Amino acid sequence: AQLAQLIHERSTDPRIADWLGACEADASLPGDPRSDAAVNLREWRRDYDRATKLPAELVVELSQTTSRAKAEWAEARKADDYARFAPWLDKIVELSKRQAECYGWPDAGEPWDALADGYESGMTAAYVAGVFTPLREKLVVLVDRLMGSSTPPSNTFNELKLPLAEQEAFVRRVSAAVGFDYQSGRLDTSSHPFCSGTHNADIRLTTRFAEDNVNDALGSTLHETGHGLYEQGLPAEHLGTPRGDSVGLSIHESQSRLWENQVGRSLEFWTWCHPILVE
C-alpha cells in the first residue's frame, strides 16, 4: 500500500502537467500522430489525466484490499472454499465502482467503460456486445450440434498421467521450440499461471502441474508463452516509454490465445508435438 501511495504521488505531481503542456505546445515536435514522440506524449497525457482523477485514499485502500484478497483467494482456491473469498470479492467490486465514479464515463456508456479503458484504451461495453452477441448466436448452434453428436471426443490425453518433472521438461521444450527465449526469461510454478517482468530481457512465466492432467500444464504454458513472446518482442530501444510497452490487453490476450488454442489445439501442432511427448 505504501508503494502504491508513493507511485500515485509521483504520477500526479503537478509538475508533470507543466511538462506535458510544454511538450504539447512545442511546435518543433513531429506533427505525425504516429511518430514516437506523439505516441509517447499522447499516452503520458492519458495516464496522467486518469491518475489525477483518483484520490490517494482510494488508491491505498484498493492496494491494501487486493493484496489481502490475493492471499485469501490462494487459500480459498486450495480448499475449494468460495465463501472464504466472497467477502473480499464484494469489497473489491465496491471499490471498483468508486474507482469508476472517479474516472467517469460518457452519457451513453456505463461504469464498466471507465474501468475497461484502463486495460484497452477506448473500449466500451457496447463495442464488446457488438462483437460477442452475434458470435454467441453461432456458438450456441455449434455447441448444440456437438453435444448431440453420437461420436464423443476421446478423453485419453486429458487422463494421461506423467510425473511432474517430466511434464516440466516437456512444456519447457515446447515453449522454447515456439520461440520463447530462456536466456531472457524463465518458467516457474504458481497456483495460477501468469506472465510478468520488468523489461523484454527479463520475462517471468509461471504454469501449474497435476500428475493426471498434462493438458492443463501444456495449455497454461502455451498461453503464458504467448504473452511472453509478445513482451520479448517489444522494441528494446523504447524501453521505459509507451512506445516500448504493450498496446493493450486485447492484443496481449490475442497472442496467448493464438498459441494456446489456434496452434496448441491444431492437428499440425500435435503431429509435431506428439513424438516429443511419448519420448
Protein language model regions, located:
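Contiguous, non-catalytic segments that form substrate-binding/exosite surfaces or channel walls
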Residues: 62-216
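Short, glycine/acidic-rich hinge or "gate" loops at secondary-structure transitions
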Residues: 85, 109, 151-156, 238-243, ...
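N-terminal helix-rich structural modules
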Residues: 1-89
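Post-HExxH zinc-binding segment in Zn-dependent metallohydrolases
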Residues: 245-279
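Secondary-structure transition/capping motifs at alpha-helix termini
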Residues: 177-183, 228-237, 263-270
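Beta-rich nucleic-acid/ligand-interaction surfaces
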Residues: 192-198, 242-252
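Active-site recognition of the HExxH zinc-binding catalytic motif
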Residues: 104, 209, 216-236, 253-260
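Short acidic (Asp/Glu) and glycine-rich catalytic loops that position anionic groups and cofactors
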Residues: 45, 201, 233-240
